[in-house]
Amino acid sequence: MIFDQKGIRKRSITVAYFYNTISQKCCDLKLRRVNNVDEQKRRIYERDLHRPGLALAGFTNLFTYKRVQIFGNTETRFLNHLDDEKERNRLFENFVRFKIPCIILTSNNKLPESLIEMATRAEIPVYSTRCSSTKAIYNITDFLDDQFSIYQQYHGSMVDVYGVGVLLVGKSGLGKSEVALDLIERGHGLVADDAVVIRRKGESTTLMARRNNIIDHFMEIRGLGVVDMKANFGIRAIREQKEVQVVAELMHWDSDTEYERLGLDAKSTKILGVELPLVQLPILPGKNITVIIEVVALNFLLKRYSNYVAAEALHSRISQVINSERTNFDGDE
């Protein structure tokens, strides 16, 4: 199966969205507003952050002003310890003339009220956090990495089977949702059905799957209708997100197609440029796809943690028997 490799990436987010969302998702950060400005007017265009040491000192030739500006102990103490108030105001005025998204003061640091007023006049939001610069940078970078990551929505079902993220794909009507439902009934977890949103952060080779926020954890079963999986099976049956580790493609049985029987020739596919193992499963009456998906997950775990592949073990055993019999035959002659 060929997947669309062209992901979608956000060009920017508003500072208002940044503040509201990160406040909900990252409780440790606990950002607080220092001034009141229209946060909708400011936008963040980059996932990287900036410590503006040289820019505060007046060197702005290479100033990456489109990034969120982090004021740690060094920056705040530099400004607070300038004896000449006029010089301090001049340097900060030179700083805020750029269209900066926002300023974040870490470690509960404070700026003189005159500098906060300058930022307010320039319509630059200023926030404060009790977190250290290291912790704040880690949390904010992780959040922005997620916001500016490449993503794409695919048709299929995403399930967590024995801790392995399995993406079920295939043409409509093959029973992907029914297989996912059966897996949930057997104690596994549903991540998404019908519309699976897959993200790739930066240059990472990890793909994270989530549900479509509109469809949520609703599932359509042909002949039955829409089922609320969370309401029916409880919180244990759903997962907020899961790494995509194996792709299982359900296919119509075709007598002219040669399907893999031994597993020596491992297939793979690519999603957003990341290579993933692919298992193609032909659909036949009486075939228990649910149990096969469980075995697919167990085989993945065996290979990852024990480097054990059943087909290779069987091939090695047969080769040893053949070589042994050949040696005995040559000895008899």
Swiss-Prot record:
Entry keywords, A to Z: ATP-binding, Kinase, Magnesium, Metal-binding, Multifunctional enzyme, Nucleotide-binding, Serine/threonine-protein kinase, Transferase
Known EC number: 2.7.11.-, 2.7.4.-
Active site: 155, 176, 194 (proton acceptor), 261
Cofactor: Mg(2+)
Chain positions covered by the region annotation Important for the catalytic mechanism of both phosphorylation and dephosphorylation: 219-228
Catalytic activity: [HPr protein]-L-serine + ATP = [HPr protein]-O-phospho-L-serine + ADP + H(+); [HPr protein]-O-phospho-L-serine + phosphate + H(+) = [HPr protein]-L-serine + diphosphate
Alphabetized PANTHER family for the sequence: HPR KINASE_PHOSPHORYLASE, PROTEIN YJDM-RELATED
Domain notes: The Walker A ATP-binding motif also binds Pi and PPi.
Record-given protein name: HPr kinase/phosphorylase
Origin species: Chlorobium chlorochromatii (strain CaD3)
Lineage: Bacteria, Pseudomonadati, Chlorobiota, Chlorobiia, Chlorobiales
Gene name in the database record: hprK
